[in-house]
């Protein structure tokens, strides 16, 4: 099955502490988890690694977020939107369900 949310898609958070925030998908970990730029930031205590010249300390980084807690952002409507699939010229493409616009 094709993925409804892919890398570099602009998404909006539907639930949780970052509700309403928008960001770009950096990485799709599995069918159910993604990493979004600037969303779900957590503090990680990191040990120094002298061999790699990395300092230790508390580092803020993005954690994975469930796909069910985000939705694709439709720039035409300015809202979160659902995604569907259809065939155009023999290829399977994604489209927004609210206005039937094809997602590039």
Swiss-Prot record:
Tell me the Gene Ontology biological-process terms attached to this UniProt entry. translation
Stored SMART domains: KOW (SM00739)
List the record's Gene Ontology CC terms alphabetically: ribonucleoprotein complex; ribosome
Entries under Gene3D superfamilies matching the protein: 2.30.30.30
Could you tell me which PROSITE patterns the record lists for this protein? RIBOSOMAL_L24 (PS01108)
Recorded GO molecular functions are:
rRNA binding; structural constituent of ribosome
Q: Which domain of life is it from?
A: Bacteria
Keywords on this record?
Ribonucleoprotein, Ribosomal protein, RNA-binding, rRNA-binding
Subunit composition?
Part of the 50S ribosomal subunit.
Family to which the UniProt record says this protein belongs? Belongs to the universal ribosomal protein uL24 family.
Function in brief? One of two assembly initiator proteins, it binds directly to the 5'-end of the 23S rRNA, where it nucleates assembly of the 50S subunit. One of the proteins that surrounds the polypeptide exit tunnel on the outside of the subunit.
- What is the official name of this protein in its record? Large ribosomal subunit protein uL24
Organism name? Yersinia enterocolitica serotype O:8 / biotype 1B (strain NCTC 13174 / 8081)
- Recorded name of the encoding gene: rplX
